[in-house]
Amino acid sequence: MDFETSPTTGGATTSSRPTDTALSTRGIRVSYGHVQALRGADFDCRAGEVTALIGDNGAGKSTLVKVLSGALAPDDGEVFVGGEPFHAHQPTDAQAAGIETVWQDLALAPDMGPVANMFLGRETRRKGLLGALGFLDDKSMAAAAQREFAQLGVTADPRRRSVSDMSGGQRQGVAVARAVSWARTVVLLDEPTAALGVVQTKGVLDMVKRVADRGLAVVLISHNMSDVLAVADRIEVLRLGQRVASYTRAEASLEQLVSTMTGGTATPESDSTNSAGGTQ
């Protein structure tokens, strides 16, 4: 991996700036009062790859997603997007940097249809009289939604009037399609298969692979180790707010991941990373 040296915040003098990744974190720290939620969760995610973040409850996964999505500013450390420092104060800052998030609750408007949800707040308009007073271009938005659904394998009908009567897998598909249609660099997926059945889960995992195949970096947060091993190119293990190990899919087994998550083992890679100050 290529690195540059650059100034950091929080009193540190230098940090490693990754130059060959879509998304990276260095020295991220977040505290809630006396509780340290993150204390050095360093990881890298490359374009066209799925990077899974796993860990037991309290490992810091949710807090890290909030930092990456712009919903929470870290107390210290840096986030890099395309090798450049990224400072977000709100989710729209992350969206401006090409980062889109699919939250576990999907954040869909239940009384609106798939197309309206995909373009909510970003509606396409036709020019009105003298270039003003434009009208919503429903036809072009519906066509764009249909193309996105077809490319990702989403089975939902974009003509439906409401997403509330769709299956869980279909709603998940709408949320993923919305994120992919606007993302330029990274898609964050927070527990995308939670509460889904076997068939729906397979459909969502197939979508995750297609998103990465389009050249986007995908960060997958999941408790389901089978899902992680099915789609992840790299697996980062968090424990007590730190990245403690990193595996490729070929290196990892279910038993090894569970043992590392719970403190049973450490890998030579994680040991060398820690001794170099990467996750302290």
Give residue ranges: language-model regions.
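Glycine-rich phosphate-binding loops of nucleotide-dependent enzymes
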Residues: 2-280
